[in-house]
Amino acid sequence: MGLHFSVLASGSTGNMLYVGTDEKKLLVDAGLSGKATEALFKQAELNINDVSGILVTHEHSDHIKGLGVLARKYDLPVYANEKTWNAMEHLIGNIPTDQKFIFSVGDVKTFGDIEVESFGVSHDAAEPMFYAFHNNNRKLALITDTGYVSDRMKGVIKGANAFVFESNHDVEMLRMGRYPWSIKRRILSDVGHVCNEDAALAMADVITDETKHIYLAHLSLDNNMKELARMSVSQVLEEKGFGVGEAFEIHDTDPKMPTKIQYV
């Protein structure tokens, strides 16, 4: 079994990604309660006791809600950059010092046979960052919670065999929706979230012949729909000359249901 993953949950109510190999299993974020997380692991037919560490992207509650509980219950080391630690420590409760580790932006760390590269994104958090996972010339890239995708970010994630990529909102749905203008402005800003079309334009710059799977992630429950996101992204990519459904597959994610285990 090579590098594989499951998007356990994705959306504004909670985010978690499982990444593993035969040798090592990791969790990125813990945005649901401990009980909900355990239920998702069972649903995905994964064993939470196999997880050997949690990587944190940033301190927003939909990414750390269950972090303290899981770290304490399963004696898991937690990795985050210094600014994120400072921002979230009062939110997650006490975690023993020997379980707290610094993973700085731009660093590369090795966990068993998985090499993990972190990179900064543009979001209204202390120092948000996401990850690219490498194993035996296979690569998985995770990028959500960013207002735009810069050339620097693209440089890290380009050529991944699989992407978990933010496709947060449809701009028209957001503009016409019930959110107050202050929240709309925040989502549309450079430190907010990427819309369907902008996500697709960024994808067009990082997809290569090696890319086989794209998972559309962090969809807004109020300002997007799975079918709309998939259609919008597919349309832009097809206009750019990509063979959606032939060269690679586009997949949905869900806030309450894990995706099937996908090998990279």
UniProtKB/Swiss-Prot annotation:
PANTHER family: EXODEOXYRIBONUCLEASE WALJ (PTHR47619:SF1), METALLO-HYDROLASE YYCJ-RELATED (PTHR47619). Belongs to the metallo-beta-lactamase superfamily. Binds 2 metal ions per subunit. The endogenous metal is unknown. Changing N224A: Significantly increases mutation frequency. SUPFAM superfamilies: Metallo-hydrolase/oxidoreductase. Changing H169A: Significantly increases mutation frequency. Gene3D superfamilies: Ribonuclease Z/Hydroxyacylglutathione hydrolase-like. This is Exodeoxyribonuclease YycJ. Changing H60A: Moderately increases mutation frequency. It comes from Bacillus anthracis. Changing D29N: Significantly increases mutation frequency. Its cofactor is Fe(2+); Zn(2+); Mn(2+). Disruption phenotype: Significantly increases mutation frequency; this frequency is increased further in a mutS mutant background. The lineage of its organism: Bacteria, Bacillati, Bacillota, Bacilli, Bacillales. A divalent metal cation 2 binds at D62, H63, D145. The keyword Metal-binding applies. A divalent metal cation 1 binds at H58, H60.
